[in-house]
Amino acid sequence: MDFGFSEEQEMLRDAAKRFLADNCPTKFVRQMMADPTAHDAAFWKKLVDLGWPGLLIPESYGGQGGSFLDMTVIVEEAGKALVPGPFFTSALLAAPLLIEGGSDQQKKDILPRMAKGEFIGTVAIAEAAGCFGFTV
């Protein structure tokens, strides 16, 4: 039984590695570390153009319809490059949670915008009253 990546996934890895070598050098990462937002709109646009924010989003919502194994290939390379910004929280955490737990209306309203990079998701939890329920 072969547990390796497919030929397409290896091609995806090579493309990601080349893209990140060209667009996410250490100097850029250090600049983003010094930026309070750690977000660069031009870099985010490049990720969007590659389809990374929508990789796990179904095609019916404007995404790539990729698998978690496809995302693993991207995340491994992004981790090696220390990719700054909202990619991990939006594409890897928030999008799958919305796909699995969001209402049909939320999916219809938000997922296409996430796939286009227009909506950046994150993960948070709070009590219904709007607090975290911690007692100080």
Where are each of the predicted segments found?
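Intrinsic disorder at enzyme termini
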Residues: 1-8
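Glycine-rich flavin
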Residues: 13, 21-136
